[in-house]
């Protein structure tokens, strides 16, 4: 009975009795309860934060998807607008070339007509001079001179028309 283990056990039982009598176990239990309550609140806070983070992530992903779709729509619209502008520019260029070609053809036709008229006029003038020269050599007298003048005037009018 005088063994040290025995006295350690007796001292422990007496200590536990004193602690129990002083309300130490209640304090330990209350402390553990408070700690458990604090842990439970922290877990609830963590759960709430996790749900909030999940909601924010979902919102972010939704907005990112919307932004990507909007960007794709903007790019598609820009591409369509560029193609339309290119087609419009091409059409304007073709129209410009067609108008210039038509104007050039009209100028060429006018120049051809003017050249043909000048050639006819020159040919008529040459024919009148040749006719006048021939008639003056062949026909003589006042009546002949009057006839030559009338004939040459008539020839000039007909050749110029």
From Swiss-Prot:
Highest rank taxon of the organism: Bacteria
Disulfide partners: none
Topology in membrane: Single-pass membrane protein
Short name of one Pfam family: ATP-synt_B
Keyword match Cell inner membrane: yes
Transmembrane segments: 5-25
Record's GO cellular component terms: plasma membrane; proton-transporting ATP synthase complex
Keyword entries, A-Z: ATP synthesis, Cell inner membrane, Cell membrane, CF(0), Hydrogen ion transport, Ion transport, Membrane, Transmembrane, Transmembrane helix, Transport
Listed InterPro entries: ATP_synth_b/b'su_bac/chlpt (IPR002146), ATP_synthase_B_chain (IPR050059)
Role noted for this protein: F(1)F(0) ATP synthase produces ATP from ADP in the presence of a proton or sodium gradient. F-type ATPases consist of two structural domains, F(1) containing the extramembraneous catalytic core and F(0) containing the membrane proton channel, linked together by a central stalk and a peripheral stalk. During catalysis, ATP synthesis in the catalytic domain of F(1) is coupled via a rotary mechanism of the central stalk subunits to proton translocation. Component of the F(0) channel, it forms part of the peripheral stalk, linking F(1) to F(0).
Subunit-structure text: F-type ATPases have 2 components, F(1) - the catalytic core - and F(0) - the membrane proton channel. F(1) has five subunits: alpha(3), beta(3), gamma(1), delta(1), epsilon(1). F(0) has three main subunits: a(1), b(2) and c(10-14). The alpha and beta chains form an alternating ring which encloses part of the gamma chain. F(1) is attached to F(0) by a central stalk formed by the gamma and epsilon chains, while a peripheral stalk is formed by the delta and b chains.
Family named by the database record: Belongs to the ATPase B chain family.
Record protein name field: ATP synthase subunit b 1
Biological source species: Methylobacterium sp. (strain 4-46)
Record gene name: atpF1
């Amino acid at each position: 009975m005088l063994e040290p283990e025995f006295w350690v056990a007796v001292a422990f039982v007496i200590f536990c009795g004193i602690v129990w009598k002083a309300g130490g176990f209640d304090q330990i239990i209350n402390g553990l309860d408070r700690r458990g309550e604090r842990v439970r609140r922290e877990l609830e806070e963590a759960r709430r934060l996790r749900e909030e983070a999940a909601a924010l992530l979902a919102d972010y992903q939704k907005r990112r998807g919307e932004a990507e779709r909007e960007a794709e729509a903007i790019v598609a619209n820009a591409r369509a607008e560029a193609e339309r502008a290119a087609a419009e520019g091409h059409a304007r260029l073709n129209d410009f070339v067609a108008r210039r070609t038509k104007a050039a053809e009209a100028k060429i036709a006018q120049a051809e007509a003017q050249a043909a008229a000048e050639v006819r006029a020159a040919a008529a003038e040459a024919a009148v001079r040749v006719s006048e020269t021939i008639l003056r050599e062949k026909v003589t007298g006042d009546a002949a001179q009057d006839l030559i003048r009338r004939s040459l005037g008539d020839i000039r009018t007909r050749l110029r028309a």
